[in-house]
Amino acid sequence: MTIGSDDLTANTSIKQIVEVIDERDKPEKLMKCLEKYTNADTKNRMIVFVLKKTDAVEVENELWNKGYNVVSIHGDKDQWQRTKALESFKRGTANVMVATDVAARGLDIPDVEAVINFSFPLTIEDYVHRIGRTGRAGKEGTAHSLFTQQDYKLAGCLVKVLKDAGQEVIDIESCVRFILNLTKLFVSRCPLRCLNLT
């Protein structure tokens, strides 16, 4: 990963999938993602990133009620609670960890098969850090992001990161144009400085 004002790249061993969806469809899409990346033979480790602490609690409770072995890490937890959750995730006792960006940097968790961005991050740098939790130590990983109309300001920069990592971006470009048309915004008003979509 390289981060700088004009030089931002993602690990090319991470398959990046971006779904442009309606905000209301996120809970259903999350369940489909978890089903997709869960392997019956192994306990695939997955991190689900959210923006807010309240979202972390809500998503953790929902997944627990659906039968997932899940823990969460966020700013309202004491350090000992975060450490306990992290150890449970590393040991495989819990195979899903719901986290705010407190877990996006500095944590070395081996064998995370998938990162799911339930809430898209506020900056493209945070996106690159989040997805960097998978595809570590020469292994491949998957980053699946749910991108909504509210995230449109990062669309151009996201497309650039995807292209630079050799990912398929045709669908997201079309969807970004669609979102911009729906919201009657013009490219000149949007911070799409990273890529000209016209």
Protein language model annotation of sequence segments:
Residues 1-198:
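Conserved helicase RecA-like core
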